[in-house]
């Protein structure tokens, strides 16, 4: 009976400060767009050039941590006493779909163009060497290295959630073993949680800022509807409504509905591109790129380009590592929630092997298709970007395929539904982090989850009003800085507590 009377409403100290901070930042940005752009460029340059090395070392250390979990003393430990909540197939699909939105399709279709037009290591733009290295860098940025980071933190949160029976899931609640209960539940812990939530809100906004133009450009191609900010707002509203429907079904039913559809559809679409684009070339290009990745891996891991100062590692590697860092806690909480009953080794291998295969397939197929279209002069990406923007260039890479109308319909549906999954995962984590007394196996209040979806949608609209990729990239970079330290503290806290309380 006591459990029925527990208050599970929002926690004011971690609910209102992020909203106020985000509101002030958005107001200052919209108030003077020119001044905001100056600040945005300065912040991006400072963080990537001065602190880029720290992000690179973070990823390397976390990779070694993954090996320690897989082959160390906790490998066979089970995350909870219950059997797995989801089947292995649904489990993998939920993980893949939660990390695959239209924002990922955005980069998968266009990323290789930037790599070959502004290549690393002093290579000539659009040269043979640049093209040989283009896909290899995509496999590097979206391969085992970042997934190992996610799996380590997922194990940490699953341990605190299901083994230690933690009642509240937010970063500060995991820091008790490291800083003590007084500081974890006091001002220090509140500051940590607010940094996390502010960064996460902007991260979700950036994903919507990348996803929405793809959908609206699809609508312009299919229906002739002009791409406007008002149309962007309508699309975001539709995502919020669909998310509310999934939430109303509960995590298990809603999660499966939201994840299975884009997962199956994405593999169907990728299979179509693979067949009609050139299966032989794609397999040869992938095989060669794996070899290039292995050859250049040490340089890629530690590439900061301090002498030539070409800007490639700052603009791409550091940006992507900040992207992974800023989403690490949010996604790890969600992935931990659906991994109850799994062993540590099973969770680590499931994420790194399964999700690496998924992202490598996506980037290989889409990147190879874009490269073929460029080499055959079927589309002029620089001209499309200059005249219409990046989203239009991406749409044209899909429209150039056979049966273009059917292909565009498939891409439109995939982008739309996949982003619903992202919003669902993020709203769930935000609600869990801003509510009190939510225990393992329970769901946060419905209205709180829907409320966060609405608020994040507003942030996405504001970022779209700013225009361009630089504000989106800067939001990720700036948000990744405080979470860089938060992630490290969560990791150290897990290691310390596990050594004391997770013995045979």
Curated annotation (Swiss-Prot):
Pfam families: BCCT. GO terms for biological process: 4-(trimethylammonio)butanoate transport; carnitine metabolic process. It is a multi-pass membrane protein. GO terms for molecular function: (R)-carnitine:4-(trimethylammonio)butanoate antiporter activity. It catalyses: 4-(trimethylamino)butanoate(in) + (R)-carnitine(out) = 4-(trimethylamino)butanoate(out) + (R)-carnitine(in). Homotrimer. This is L-carnitine/gamma-butyrobetaine antiporter.
């Amino acid at each position: 009976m006591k459990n029925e009377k527990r208050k599970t409403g929002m926690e004011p100290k971690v609910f209102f400060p992020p909203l106020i901070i985000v509101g002030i930042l958005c107001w200052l940005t919209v108030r003077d767009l020119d001044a905001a752009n100056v600040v945005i460029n300065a912040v991006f340059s400072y963080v990537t050039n001065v602190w880029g090395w720290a992000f690179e070392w973070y990823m390397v250390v976390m990779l070694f941590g993954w090996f320690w979990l897989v082959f160390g003393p906790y490998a066979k430990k089970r995350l909870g006493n219950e059997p797995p909540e989801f089947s292995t197939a649904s489990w993998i699909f939920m993980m893949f779909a939660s990390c695959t939105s239209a924002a990922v399709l955005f980069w998968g279709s266009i990323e290789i163009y930037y790599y070959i037009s502004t290549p690393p290591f002093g290579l000539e733009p659009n040269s043979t060497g640049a093209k040989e290295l283009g896909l290899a860098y995509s496999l590097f940025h979206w391969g085992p290295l970042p997934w190992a980071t996610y799996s380590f933190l997922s194990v940490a949160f699953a341990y605190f959630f299901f083994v230690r029976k933690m009642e509240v899931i937010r970063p500060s609640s995991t820091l008790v073993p490291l800083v003590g209960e007084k500081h974890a539940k006091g001002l220090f812990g509140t500051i940590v949680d607010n940094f996390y939530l502010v960064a996460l809100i902007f991260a979700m906004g950036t994903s919507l800022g990348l996803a929405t133009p793809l959908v609206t450009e699809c609508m312009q191609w299919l229906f002739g509807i002009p791409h406007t900010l008002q149309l962007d707002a309508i699309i975001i509203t539709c995502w919020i409504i669909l998310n509310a429907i999934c939430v109303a079904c509960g995590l298990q039913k809603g999660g499966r509905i939201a994840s299975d559809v884009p997962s199956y559809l994405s593999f169907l679409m990728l299979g179509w591109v693979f067949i009609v684009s050139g299966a032989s070339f794609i397999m040869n290009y992938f095989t060669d790129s794996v070899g290039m990745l292995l050859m250049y891996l040490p340089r890629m891991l530690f590439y900061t380009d301090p002498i030539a100062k070409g800007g490639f590692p700052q603009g791409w590697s550091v940006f992507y590592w900040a992207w992974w860092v800023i989403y690490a806690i949010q996604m790890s909480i969600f992935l931990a929630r659906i991994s109850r009953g799994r062993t540590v080794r099973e969770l680590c291998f499931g994420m790194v092997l399964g999700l690496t295969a998924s992202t490598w397939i996506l980037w290989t197929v889409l990147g190879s298709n874009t490269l073929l279209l460029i080499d055959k002069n079927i589309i002029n990406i620089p001209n499309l970007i200059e005249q219409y923007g990046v989203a239009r260039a991406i749409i044209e890479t899909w429209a150039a395929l056979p049966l273009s109308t059917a292909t565009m319909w498939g891409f439109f549906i995939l982008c739309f539904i996949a982003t619903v999954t992202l919003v669902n995962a993020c709203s769930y984590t935000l609600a869990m982090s801003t509510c009190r007394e939510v225990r393992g196996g329970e769901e946060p209040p419905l209205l709180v989850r829907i409320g966060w979806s609405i608020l994040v949608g507003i942030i996405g609209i504001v970022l779209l009003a700013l225009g361009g990729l630089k504000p989106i990239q800067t939001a990720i970079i700036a948000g990744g800085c405080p979470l860089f330290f938060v992630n490290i503290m969560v990791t150290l806290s897990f290691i310390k507590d596990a050594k004391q309380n997770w013995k045979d």
